[in-house]
Regions:
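Rossmann-like NAD(P)H-binding beta-loop-alpha module
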Residues: 1-3
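Rossmann-like dinucleotide-binding domain that binds NAD(P)(H)
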Residues: 5-70, 113-120
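Short, histidine-centered active-site or binding-site loop motifs used for metal coordination
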Residues: 8-10, 77-79, 103
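A short glycine-threonine-serine/GTX helix/turn-capping micro-motif
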Residues: 14-20, 83-87, 109
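A general structural signal for well-ordered alpha-helical segments in protein cores
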Residues: 26-27, 93-97, 122
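Solvent-exposed, non-membrane alpha-helical residues enriched in polar/charged side chains
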Residues: 31, 100-101
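C-terminal substrate-binding/catalytic lobe of Rossmann-fold NAD(P)-dependent oxidoreductases
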Residues: 47-99
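C-terminal helix-rich "cap/oligomerization" subdomain common to oxidoreductases
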Residues: 102-142
Length: 142
C-alpha cells in the first residue's frame, strides 16, 4: 500500500462537539487499519468539509470528513486499487458488548493508551484545521 483514503462524517462546527463527535470512529478506523503511529496531520476546510492527510512514516492517508450517506475506503497499491464500503451498521452493538464485558470483568475493554489514542489524533486534527498548518500528533501512550 502506497497511499489510502476514506470518507466519514464529521463537522468542524458540529453542535455536538465538532470533529470529536464522529471523529473518534475515524481515528479508530485509521489505527485499526494502519496502526497507531500517526506522525502528523494537515487539514483544509472548504465549504464546511474537512479534508485531512494523516502522515505515517511510509504512508499518507487522506480522510474526507463530509456529511454523506455512504462511507468508503480505498487502498492504492503500485499495481492496483482496492475500494471497499465501510459498514457501520453493527458499531453500536459491538461497542455496547465491549462495555458490558468491561463492567462484568471489571477491566477496561482496551489498554488506556488505545482508548486515549483517538483523542490525541483528533486534538492534532482540530489544531491543523484551525491553524491551516501541519500539526504533530502526540506519541502513543504505552
Amino acid at each position: 500500500v502506497i497511499s489510502a483514503g476514506l470518507n466519514f462524517p464529521g463537522e468542524l462546527d458540529s453542535p455536538y462537539g465538532g470533529l470529536y463527535f464522529y471523529g473518534g470512529h475515524t481515528a479508530e478506523i485509521l489505527t485499526t487499519a494502519f496502526g497507531p503511529d500517526i506522525i502528523s496531520v494537515k487539514a483544509d476546510v472548504t465549504a464546511g468539509n474537512v479534508i485531512a492527510v494523516f502522515k505515517y512514516a511510509s504512508l499518507g492517508v487522506c480522510v474526507n470528513f463530509a456529511e454523506v450517506s455512504e462511507f468508503h475506503a480505498a487502498l492504492y497499491g503500485a499495481k492496483e486499487v482496492a475500494v471497499h464500503s465501510i459498514d457501520i451498521s453493527t458499531i453500536y452493538r459491538q461497542g455496547f458488548a465491549k462495555f458490558v464485558q468491561g463492567v462484568l470483568t471489571r477491566t477496561p475493554p482496551e489498554p488506556y493508551g488505545t482508548l486515549l489514542r483517538p483523542v490525541q489524533i483528533l486534538n492534532a486534527l482540530v489544531e491543523a484545521a484551525q491553524t491551516g498548518r501541519e500539526a504533530f500528533v502526540a506519541p502513543p501512550l504505552e
